[in-house]
From Swiss-Prot:
Reactions this protein catalyses: a 2-demethylmenaquinol + S-adenosyl-L-methionine = a menaquinol + S-adenosyl-L-homocysteine + H(+); a 2-methoxy-6-(all-trans-polyprenyl)benzene-1,4-diol + S-adenosyl-L-methionine = a 5-methoxy-2-methyl-3-(all-trans-polyprenyl)benzene-1,4-diol + S-adenosyl-L-homocysteine + H(+)
Biological process according to GO: aerobic respiration; menaquinone biosynthetic process; methylation
Lineage: Bacteria, Pseudomonadati, Pseudomonadota, Gammaproteobacteria, Lysobacterales
Record-linked Gene3D superfamilies: Vaccinia Virus protein VP39 (3.40.50.150)
Species name: Xanthomonas axonopodis pv. citri (strain 306)
Residues that coordinate or bind S-adenosyl-L-methionine: 76, 97, 125-126, 142
Catalytic class of the enzyme: transferase
Annotated PROSITE patterns: SAM_MT_UBIE, UBIE_1, UBIE_2
Protein name in UniProt: Ubiquinone/menaquinone biosynthesis C-methyltransferase UbiE
This protein's record includes keyword Membrane: no
Entry EC no(s): 2.1.1.163, 2.1.1.201
Length: 253
């Protein structure tokens, strides 16, 4: 298990080294800035494919009617809506996010669609979840783990609140596997994406950070190992779209 950033005192914010205690605030400023344009951000970062990734992520999850699910870094609620379709009227989805602005957007969006029953909204830090042990049948986090300061602590907390027999799933931008595609992907990430962010959201810096944060996130095998160290069993991952994103899964047994 790697040393906690809070112990070493420093961590990364994109390609910058910053004090570990400051990263949460810096990340919060990014997501407060992009909250109202979050779906646009994902469209720009993924060329629109994120919607298919998310549908597959939920469709292949271990979940059944009546289950209680926690969706961390739940953002604008798109994953939560898909999960609610799986758990049905008897089940419940808790949408958790550390950023109040993102949580507000998600709540407003679902309420405006008439989706009220069976959803709860909790502002929470993935490193210290405010839930009892063994609270959830399934735990998901999509495009959020890379922004967490202490990922090991977050994975341990995910394991703690998961019921025995439950599954945790992580959908995250990862390491591209095709060498020929890497220069194209880098060009899009560092040359095109910030300009699109400036053009459509008047915010090039946030989009620059988001591109950099992907490169600092642990690659597939490393994250699989981190999940195992946190206690998860039967850990595995599946690359999507040539490793642009990966789905990691682990179980509490």
């Amino acid at each position: 298990m790697s040393e906690s950033p809070y112990t070493s005192g420093t961590t990364h914010f994109g390609f910058r080294d910053v004090a570990a205690k400051d990263k949460q605030k810096l990340v919060g400023e990014v997501f407060t800035s992009v909250a109202r344009n979050y779906d646009l951000m994902n469209d720009l970062m993924s060329l629109g494919v994120h919607r298919a990734w998310k549908r597959y992520f939920v469709a292949t999850a271990q979940v059944k009617p009546g289950d209680r699910v926690l969706d961390l870094a739940g953002g604008t609620g798109d994953i939560a809506v898909l999960l609610k379709e799986r758990v049905g009227n008897e089940g419940a989805v808790v949408l958790g996010d550390i950023n109040a602005g993102m949580l507000s957007v998600g709540r407003d969006r679902l309420t405006n669609r008439g989706l009220v029953s069976g959803f709860d909204y909790v502002q929470c830090n993935a490193e210290a979840l405010p839930f009892p042990d063994q609270s959830f049948d399934l735990l998901t986090i999509s495009f959020g783990l890379r922004n967490v300061t202490d990922k090991d602590a977050a994975l341990r907390e995910m394991y703690r609140v998961l019921k025995v027999g439950g599954q945790a799933r992580v959908l995250e931008f990862s390491e591209v596997t095709a060498d020929w595609f890497k220069p194209i992907y880098d060009f899009h990430s560092f040359k095109i994406l910030p300009r699109l962010g400036q053009l459509f959201a008047r915010d090039a810096d946030s989009y620059q950070y988001l591109a950099e944060s992907i490169r600092k996130h642990p690659p597939q095998e490393s994250l699989k190992g981190m999940m195992g160290e946190a206690g998860f069993a039967r850990c595995h991952f599946k690359n999507l779209t040539g490793g642009i994103v990966a789905i990691h899964s682990g179980y509490k047994i």
